[in-house]
Amino acid sequence: MFAAMLICSVVFTSCEKDELEVQQNYPFELKVMPVPGEVKNGQTVEIRVTIERSGNFNDANYSIRYFQFDGQGTLRFHDELPYMPNDVYQLSTMQFRLYYTSQSTVSQSFDIWVSDNFGNEKQVSFQFSNKD
């Protein structure tokens, strides 16, 4: 009798919520294809990036920003204008290609950050030596 009452109380209290809880916040990882370690002035390097989500929520939005702290160069998405350092740009796909063009005769280093609209953020660092 006690077991039946316990089961009934668990069943009835578990159905108190009217709304179904849907997980929206899924962590993600960035996968980057290998890039050359050396670049010469004026050379463009393709950087292939994939956002790998641990779950799927259709309303998840992703953005990218970057900052170059050594050397000089530009980073752009496809045929768009070069990104401005620390400005945020929306990403429309989970797989994308960035193009870094060296404008320096010394070593170059920069970081990119990809964020979602739930506060998750991943950083990837790149470093290129000068190629004569």
Positions of PLM-derived features:
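First exposed extracellular module after export/assembly in secreted or surface-exposed proteins
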Residues: 24-132
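Bacterial N-terminal signal peptides that target proteins for export
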Residues: 1-2
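Bacterial Sec-dependent N-terminal signal peptides
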Residues: 8-32
